[in-house]
Swiss-Prot record:
It comes from the Eukaryota. Heterohexadecamer of 8 large and 8 small subunits. The gene is RBCS4. Pfam families: RbcS, RuBisCO_small. Keywords: Calvin cycle, Carbon dioxide fixation, Chloroplast, Photorespiration, Photosynthesis, Plastid, Transit peptide. GO terms for biological process: photorespiration; reductive pentose-phosphate cycle. This is Ribulose bisphosphate carboxylase small subunit, chloroplastic 4. It is found in: Plastid, Chloroplast. It comes from Flaveria pringlei.
Length: 178
């Protein structure tokens, strides 16, 4: 018996470009909008701080820990702390006091993974002051905490109970020598 095999040839044709297709990205626009010549390096036109560099100081890198918001400033007075608490209350944040007896700064002891630090969570002084409307109430609690723990770091935080986030935190008191 004879075997007959048949081969079918298929022809593929390229389809013409569709009229509604978006043109491919061809690069940036021409350089016509940019200046053709480079400016000379004329340093007399650079911005200046008016020679105030001589009176600026560098934060000493040793022996001075940086804590939180406002930590680069000198210790705040009672009046300045009260103004910060007023700001916190104006923003409808709930004031809360926290204190730490041993480590007033973040450190690494229990884990070496990136982003994890010990010392971020301090002991809360009483309960958050929900309904507080006067900075004098917060300052009274601060004085009580200082009286109970004179060698503690004490910070005031502002908590937004709607978004459930801490919005502000600053050191209100540090132990002697810090």
């Amino acid at each position: 018996m004879a075997s007959i095999s048949s081969t079918v040839a298929t022809v593929s044709r390229a389809a013409p470009a569709q009229a509604n297709m978006v043109a491919p990205f061809t690069g940036l626009k021409s350089n016509a909008a940019f200046p053709a010549t480079k400016k000379a390096n004329d340093f007399s036109t650079l911005p200046s701080n008016g020679g105030r560099v001589q009176c600026m100081k560098v934060w000493p890198p040793l022996g001075k820990k940086k804590y939180e918001t406002l930590s680069y400033l000198p210790n705040l007075t009672e009046a300045q702390l009260a103004k910060e608490v007023d700001y916190l209350l104006r923003n409808k944040w709930v004031p809360c006091l926290e204190f730490e007896l041993e480590h007033g700064f973040v450190y690494r002891e229990n884990a070496r993974s990136p982003g994890y630090y010990d010392g971020r969570y301090w002991t809360m002084w009483k309960l958050p002051m929900f309904g507080c409307t006067d900075s004098a109430q917060v300052m009274k609690e601060l004085q009580e905490c200082k009286k109970e723990y004179p060698q503690a770091w004490i910070r005031i935080i502002g908590f937004d109970n709607v978004r459930q986030v801490q919005c502000i935190s600053f050191i209100a008191s540090k132990p002697d020598g810090f």
